[in-house]
Each structure stands twice: as C-alpha cells, then as structure tokens.
Regions:
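Short, Lys/Arg-enriched, disordered terminal segments
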Residues: 1-10, 251-253
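Short amphipathic alpha-helical surface micro-motifs
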Residues: 1-5, 60-61, 183-184, 206-207
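Active-site beta->alpha loop and helix N-cap motifs at the rims of alpha/beta catalytic domains
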Residues: 2-4, 12-133, 143-147
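Arginine residue identity/basic-tract feature
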Residues: 5-7, 48, 69, 82, ...
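Solvent-exposed alpha-helices and their adjacent loops that cap or buttress functional pockets
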Residues: 9-14, 70, 105-107, 162-163, ...
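Catalytic alpha/beta core domains of metabolic enzymes, predominantly
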Residues: 112, 117-253
Length: 253
C-alpha cells in the first residue's frame, strides 16, 4: 500500500487523518474560519467551493485561494466543488467543472482537488491529468445520500476510481439500518486487503454510520471528516471529539 504525501501530512499511514470542511458563503467568512484552525486538530482543510457566492467567477475563486493559502500556512488544502447531484449546493456544466478544477490545480494554492467519478470518464481523466501535470493530487469521489449499495458495487466503484488514476478513492453512502454500516465496513476491508495500492476514504453517513468515521484505522479508511463549526454532511462529529476517539483507538491497536 502506497501512502499519499501532501506537504507534511502522510495519508494512509498510522492514525486516520482529520479533514475539516469550510462551507462559508462569503470570502470574509471563509478566511475568518480558516484563521481559527490553528486552535484545533486538523490535518487537511477542505474548501467546499460550491458554497462560495463567487464560485462561477474564477478571479474571485483565485482571490480566496490566495488568502486561504496564507491563512492555512502549511496545512494541506483540498478544493471540492460538490455538485447538486451528489448533495452539493450548486449545479455546474461539465466543461466549467473541469476548467475550475484544473485552473485551481495550476494556481499553486491547492494541494488536492476532488473529482466526482460519475461526471464521465473523459472529464474525470482530463481533470486528473491536468491536476497531476500541476503536481496536485486527486481525490475521486462518489456520494449516495439515499442508500448503501451492495458490497460488490462499493468495491467496484472504488476500483474504478483507482483505475482512472485518482490518488485517493473516496465513497460516502447513507445507511438505512445498522447492517448497511457493516456492508460499508466490509467493502472497505475487502478493497484494502485485495485491490487497493493507495489510500482510500470511506464513510457511512448520519448518526447510524458514525462508527465508520471513527474506526478507519481498523478497516482501512485513511481520512475522516470532522466539523469545526458547521458540518458539511450528516453524521460529522466535532473535530476535538473525533481526534480523541481516533487517538484512543490508535493506542489500543
């Protein structure tokens, strides 16, 4: 299993890394929140750019990225436009989606970009190639806010992301019951033990699935999302509590 290194953080080694999302609407809110992150345990910051009011004007995006980079110091930055079809705030045309991600990668301010794997293989490949050419890593993602697919389906989606060249495959699914959480954990273990040659990120959402955000080191999920202020997905814990549990489990393993 290879790890993925972004700045001083090694994803896929030891304790699962903690990623904290920023979901501010205005530049002022986004930068103000970023400036508080030195007070909390955070390994990676995700800017959910789909929440930003100026997202469709790249000059405004670049302006925020520049100040975000300064506010975050050496903390790695993941930029994510989560589309409305996968639970995000806005819809976007494929060409604009590719351009936004590639331009962000080329800016020198971001360390990772997120690409939704079901955008279409050609667009996904274009973004991955563009990001890699700029020295930026790619998280390929898929989110199902309604159900938990079968174990084989989850594994196949993660394998598809790996085959397309993403550095870190990621899937988030919604449990209808406790058995669905076990399905996600079993799929994670199978992917890691049989197919993955790189770190993966998996989670079962909402309160029912919260255990999956805590036990990544046991089953093989390399990064987990915690909330500093507003959660960006159902089931996210506060970052301090999350860190406490991750460390307790790590010390017992």
């Amino acid at each position: 299993m290879n790890t993925v290194r972004v700045r001083d953080i090694e994803i896929g080694a030891g304790v699962p890394k903690i990623c904290v999302p920023i979901v501010g609407v205005t530049k002022e809110d986004i930068i103000a929140e970023a400036k508080t992150f030195h007070e909390i345990p955070v390994d990676v910051v995700e800017w959910r750019v789909d929440w930003f009011e100026g997202v469709f004007d790249f000059d405004q995006v670049l302006d925020v990225l520049k100040d975000l980079r300064e506010a975050l110091g050496n903390t790695p930055l993941l930029m994510t436009f989560r589309t409305s079809k996968e639970g995000g705030e806005k819809a976007i045309e494929d060409a604009a989606y590719a351009e936004l991600n590639i331009k962000a990668a080329q800016s020198g301010y971001v360390d990772l970009v997120d690409v939704e794997v079901f955008t279409g293989d050609e667009i996904v490949k274009e973004i991955i190639e563009g990001a890699h050419a700029a020295g930026v890593k790619v998280v390929a993602s898929n989110h199902d806010f309604f159900k938990t697919p079968a174990k084989e389906d989850i594994v196949n989606r993660l394998r598809k992301m790996q085959d397309l060249g993403a550095d870190i495959p990621k899937i988030a699914v919604m449990p209808q019951n406790k058995k669905d959480v076990l399905t996600l954990l079993a799929a994670t273990e199978e992917m890691v033990s049989e197919y993955a040659d790189r770190p993966i990120i998996t989670m079962s959402m909402a309160g029912t699935g919260v255990i999956s955000r805590l036990c990544g080191e046991v089953f093989g999920s390399a990064l987990t999302f915690g909330a500093a202020k507003k959660a960006s997905a159902p089931g996210q814990m506060g970052v301090n509590d999350l860190n406490t549990v991750l460390q307790l489990l790590h010390n017992a393993l």
